Amino acid sequence: MVNTDNKENEPPNMEKAHMDSSNALYRVQRPLQRRPLQELSIELVKPSQTITVKKSKKSTNSSSYFAQLHAASGQNPPPSVHSSHKQPSKARSPNPLLSMR
């Protein structure tokens, strides 16, 4: 009878210990989950700004690299591609204005 009492008493004690530990872990995990999200959002914003600056500075390097890719693929060189991209963007700006009027 003593053995059965011990066995019956052990599972609730173990469950209570698990409940306490899970609550403690849950309490610890919540702030840990919140903090990295804020830090990550800040970290993700900063590199994007530095990358845009790098792109503007290295535009000649990237264009030469793309020129090699376009030459290899047999498409038009990048200057004509860039000019064609600029023209539609100018044509697109009046279109929304006309459609809104």
Curated annotation (Swiss-Prot):
Main location class: cytoplasm
Coiled-coil annotated residue ranges, if any: none
Compartment list: Cytoplasm; Nucleus
Induction: Preferentially expressed under nitrogen starvation conditions.
Region named Disordered: 1-101
Composition skew (Basic and acidic residues), residue ranges: 1-19
Keywords tagged on the record: Cytoplasm, Meiosis, Nucleus
Gene Ontology BP terms: meiosis I/meiosis II transition; metaphase/anaphase transition of meiosis I; negative regulation of metaphase/anaphase transition of meiotic cell cycle
GO CC, any one term: nucleus
Subunit structure as annotated in this protein's UniProt entry: Interacts with slp1.
Protein's name according to its UniProt entry: Protein mes1
Lineage, broadest ranks: Eukaryota, Fungi, Dikarya, Ascomycota, Taphrinomycotina
Encoding gene (name): mes1
